[in-house]
Swiss-Prot record:
The keyword Coiled coil does not apply. This is Alpha-ketoglutarate-dependent dioxygenase FTO. Gene3D superfamilies: Alpha-ketoglutarate-dependent dioxygenase AlkB-like (2.60.120.590), FTO C-terminal domain (1.20.58.1470). The lineage of its organism: Eukaryota, Metazoa, Chordata, Craniata, Vertebrata. It comes from Homo sapiens (Human). It is found in: Nucleus; Nucleus speckle; Cytoplasm. RNA demethylase that mediates oxidative demethylation of different RNA species, such as mRNAs, tRNAs and snRNAs, and acts as a regulator of fat mass, adipogenesis and energy homeostasis. Specifically demethylates N(6)-methyladenosine (m6A) RNA, the most prevalent internal modification of messenger RNA (mRNA) in higher eukaryotes. M6A demethylation by FTO affects mRNA expression and stability. Also able to demethylate m6A in U6 small nuclear RNA (snRNA). It catalyses: a 5'-end (N(7)-methyl 5'-triphosphoguanosine)-(N(6),2'-O-dimethyladenosine) in mRNA + 2-oxoglutarate + O2 = a 5'-end (N(7)-methyl 5'-triphosphoguanosine)-(2'-O-methyladenosine) in mRNA + formaldehyde + succinate + CO2; an N(6)-methyladenosine in mRNA + 2-oxoglutarate + O2 = an adenosine in mRNA + formaldehyde + succinate + CO2; N(6)-methyladenosine in U6 snRNA + 2-oxoglutarate + O2 = adenosine in U6 snRNA + formaldehyde + succinate + CO2; a 5'-end (N(7)-methyl 5'-triphosphoguanosine)-(N(6),2'-O-dimethyladenosine) in U6 snRNA + 2-oxoglutarate + O2 = a 5'-end (N(7)-methyl 5'-triphosphoguanosine)-(2'-O-methyladenosine) in U6 snRNA + formaldehyde + succinate + CO2. Ubiquitously expressed, with relatively high expression in adrenal glands and brain; especially in hypothalamus and pituitary. Highly expressed in highly expressed in acute myeloid leukemias (AML) with t(11;11)(q23;23) with KMT2A/MLL1 rearrangements, t(15;17)(q21;q21)/PML-RARA, FLT3-ITD, and/or NPM1 mutations. It is an enzyme of class 1 (oxidoreductase).
Amino acid sequence: MKRTPTAEEREREAKKLRLLEELEDTWLPYLTPKDDEFYQQWQLKYPKLILREASSVSEELHKEVQEAFLTLHKHGCLFRDLVRIQGKDLLTPVSRILIGNPGCTYKYLNTRLFTVPWPVKGSNIKHTEAEIAAACETFLKLNDYLQIETIQALEELAAKEKANEDAVPLCMSADFPRVGMGSSYNGQDEVDIKSRAAYNVTLLNFMDPQKMPYLKEEPYFGMGKMAVSWHHDENLVDRSAVAVYSYSCEGPEEESEDDSHLEGRDPDIWHVGFKISWDIETPGLAIPLHQGDCYFMLDDLNATHQHCVLAGSQPRFSSTHRVAECSTGTLDYILQRCQLALQNVCDDVDNDDVSLKSFEPAVLKQGEEIHNEVEFEWLRQFWFQGNRYRKCTDWWCQPMAQLEALWKKMEGVTNAVLHEVKREGLPVEQRNEILTAILASLTARQNLRREWHARCQSRIARTLPADQKPECRPYWEKDDASMPLPFDLTDIVSELRGQLLEAKP
């Protein structure tokens, strides 16, 4: 079943088409460090983008981080994601793993990634290999370092803005003079700045361009092959920073003299591209990334600008540290939601039957919405990614089993509601109120089950290795006596809709 694009997706696609039409066969201008106006343009139009050269980071940290990348790659911990874009399933050219606070998730391109936990204070985490545990600890150490650097950069930005200066440091080397906060800097600013740099996850990326011959060409500026297309990072706390550590493996790190006369960027070196969203007047930037360089996107840069990653010739890792918007994306959150939904269940029933305290329409509506949330935002998202997380840790096994048990109880709740709707003697008005309260959720449930089942059976899904193959879970056959309702709700939804239509004058 083809999904209808959202209004936001349609608007974005329309903007893209209009921009390409305006360009016709011409390229927009972009600048690299070889261009005389490169740094001036950076200062004027991209002041919240900061590059910190590799030389400003300690050799010890470089060594630890780069070994951690290679360790995770050796153990097969990074995976290409089967993502959903405008109703189509696509396999990302980049392999990824999410590391971060225990129980956190991060959603991008309609895919919820679950953290391989790093060892935060007070946690007791078991990884499958000691080397994997050590690598996760290293990325927590890098996270702490980048958080400190981000806070410093945000303080410098705040100080300069308050002093009405129109420049921030662009390329901060090891001996860059630090700027302190002015007297107008207050405690609330400090709290705000720290929260914007409170990185709770890092999304690790890896790609070997030699094994990806079909990479897309950058469409607006002619920047060459893209590893990651133009985008804003999704699902982040508003105005929070993003910090990226880049590690391109051994290869040509400097432009050769023969290439110095070439226009545009060196295709052998990885770059990050920046442009102002939907702006065809301001030149874009292509910033070369050498081994161990870090860059920071501060304040609202991620909202006002788009960025892409331009492939070099050598394999590259990156660690992208983010303040993920987790208000609806933690294990604690979804467990609390499940408990809220099940507050309506009577606890004194001895058998497996579910008895409800209330048939108040608002209570039933909330319960069915939570039922959908745990099924489609958590269980199906997790199992669609196969058994990949077991490569690193069993941390999610028990929570997923717990969520599935709670979800199964919610199936019993839905069954109890349907029994009530059919009960003889139930006033017509009350029946209609219940039907109106639950029908939208049940219709969505049926449609989404069909969609997820089809995704798991798709041709591209069948090509994945066994441990990454999507699993349609929960799934059960019609004759499964342990389940109160069928997997396919078509007949039930049709019957309920018919009852509601009959009742209308």
